[in-house]
């Protein structure tokens, strides 16, 4: 059930009596109350770790939960058991498919929100020691299987058929409110049309409802997004009714809505491409107290490029922003496979080098590790990342719980 914010607080007042002793007693009581209020305010300013915002500052190592894992009770039980047995893991990151949590009756037109899945996750994390949740809104998805998607609510899923794809049977319909980015079998992809007022208005209402329901929960630490790359639309942006710049503007509108509604939790969106878009966003992140996340931390050319002119890669901003905004580079399958990204030969870097890059070169406060095999659990020829986390001295011996990452709050954290 949504948290009830309708309660009110009353302040007790002094009732002056006719006698001087009662008046003096009341005066002393008032002075005592004022003194306690002053001391409390002073503690909030000068004593580290005493502000309410600290309840949401939980830097460290998190695990990314794939949607197929989220939909499997057996998989989730395994993940909770890993969290229970691994103090070095700070929590999990869950990707929010908008259509799973909002639906509409076409006859009435009113949105219904069902956040029971998140309620269950937060309850399970709350029952564990020092475990927290990051939620990430999916404005982009990749599809390899047939069938409908939950990237959009049910009433926004219908649309005109687009017949140029010879493998069109991969999905039951086309999306009127999402544009396609690929025709390659196994690599179908969609982005929400964030330039459209209908989508932005509905997302604004969804985020308001989501925040009202979970933002006060002490085990929620962040809200994020999927990556900023917008891809190349199969049909041109002009045909679709938008433009690349308007799509990027829509991303910023969604991020600002998160910042508006999630007043307790930190906002750390995911940026990778375009480099020009990232360059335009960095000053805004600094000015508005928004963090910087990235879905990969490898040395792919596009991520680390520092041209003599033009926009640099997103990972070049991390060291210079350390101490200013929250930094959250992630470790995904591409990072396990190759030092230099998905389009280079695999060299399977040592887990220590992957971790040290995130910690020392990128100055991370948070990192999210993809829980994909064989890397996570290991096999006959692949070591286990989970066992690395459970045994690496710099992670195990960090008393702050941050897994060796930078646990000092940046200026942007309230």
Model feature map: region roles:
Residues 124-126, 183-224, 250, 254-257:
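An active-site-proximal structural segment forming one wall of the substrate-binding cleft
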Residues 296-414:
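Substrate-binding cleft of secreted/luminal carbohydrate-active enzymes
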């Amino acid at each position: 059930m949504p948290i009830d914010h309708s309660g009110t607080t009353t302040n007790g007042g002094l009732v002056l009596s006719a006698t001087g002793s009662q008046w003096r007693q009341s005066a002393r009581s008032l002075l005592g109350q004022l003194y306690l209020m002053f001391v409390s305010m002073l503690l909030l300013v000068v004593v580290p770790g005493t502000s309410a915002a600290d309840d949401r500052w939980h830097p460290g190592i998190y695990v990314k939960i794939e949607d197929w894992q989220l939909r499997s009770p057996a998989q989730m039980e395994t993940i909770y058991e890993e969290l229970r047995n691994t103090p070095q893991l700070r929590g999990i990151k869950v990707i929010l498919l908008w259509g799973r949590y909002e639906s509409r009756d076409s006859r009435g037109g009113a949105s219904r929100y069902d956040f029971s899945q998140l309620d269950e996750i937060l309850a399970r994390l709350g029952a564990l020691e020092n475990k927290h949740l990051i939620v990430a809104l999916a404005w982009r998805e990749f599809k390899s299987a047939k069938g409908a998607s939950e990237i959009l609510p049910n009433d926004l899923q219908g649309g005109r058929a687009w017949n140029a794809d010879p493998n069109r049977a991969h999905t039951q319909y086309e999306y009127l409110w999402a544009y396609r980015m690929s025709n390659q079998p196994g690599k179908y992809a969609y982005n929400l049309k964030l330039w459209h007022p209908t989508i932005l208005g509905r997302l604004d209402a969804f985020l308001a409802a989501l925040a009202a329901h979970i933002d006060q929960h002490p085990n929620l630490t962040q809200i994020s997004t999927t990556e900023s790359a917008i891809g190349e639309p199969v049909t041109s942006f002009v045909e679709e009714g938008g433009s690349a710049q308007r799509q990027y503007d829509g991303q910023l509108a969604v991020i600002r809505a998160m910042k508006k509604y999630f007043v307790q939790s930190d906002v750390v969106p995911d940026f990778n491409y375009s480099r020009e878009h990232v360059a335009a966003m960095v000053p805004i992140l600094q000015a508005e107290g928004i963090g910087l996340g990235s879905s990969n931390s490898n040395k792919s050319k596009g991520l680390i490029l520092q041209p003599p002119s033009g926009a640099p890669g997103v990972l070049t901003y991390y060291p210079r922003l350390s101490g200013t905004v929250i930094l959250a580079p992630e470790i995904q399958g591409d990072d396990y496979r190759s030092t230099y990204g998905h389009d280079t030969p695999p060299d399977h870097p040592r887990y220590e080098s992957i971790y040290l890059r995130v910690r020392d070169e990128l100055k991370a406060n948070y990192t999210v590790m993809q829980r994909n095999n064989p890397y996570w659990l290991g096999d006959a020829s692949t070591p286990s990342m989970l066992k690395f986390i459970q045994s690496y001295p710099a992670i195990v011996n960090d008393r702050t719980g941050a897994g060796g990452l930078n646990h000092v709050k940046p200026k942007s954290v309230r």
